[in-house]
C-alpha cells in the first residue's frame, strides 16, 4: 500500500462518533485536512498509548507534552512487514523508506540520525541539517511545520509533520529531516 494510517491505532475507536474521517463536515467531524476530508476532533487516545510525560515507557516524543508508548514503533514495523506487495503496478509508498532506516541502523550499528550526522552532515559543514532540531535549537529558530495539527491538537514547530515519522519518535527513513535552504543547496551542489 502507498500509505498506512498507523496513528489510527492509538485512537480509541469508542471515542469517535461514526467513522474517524468522512467527506463532509458535521458536529463531530470539524477538522478539515484536505478539500473533501474532515476528521473527528473530539477523539481520545487508547489507554496506555499516550502520556503527557517522558517516562521509560513513553519515549517517542511526538509534540509538546505528547509522548507515545515506545512499543508502538515495533508495531509499525510489524504491520509493514505483513504488507503484501502488488507486483502488477508501481505505486509510490513511503513504507520502504521506513524500512530503509532499519537497514541503515542494522548495518551501521548506530541510530540513523547519529550515523548521518557523523558521516554526512558534519563533514559537509552542515550545522542545521538534522533530525530532532529541538535538541539543538529553540522554536524561535525553526520554521513551524503545521498549524493546529489534527492528531496532536497543537501547532507543530520543531517536530516532524508526517504522522508515521512522528509515531516513530521523529527519526524515520521517510520523513523528519530538518534543514535550511542554504544547506539543502550545499547537498545539491555535492550531488552535481
Task: Specify the residue positions occupied by each region the protein language model found.
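Short, surface-exposed loop or secondary-structure junction motifs
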Residues: 1-192
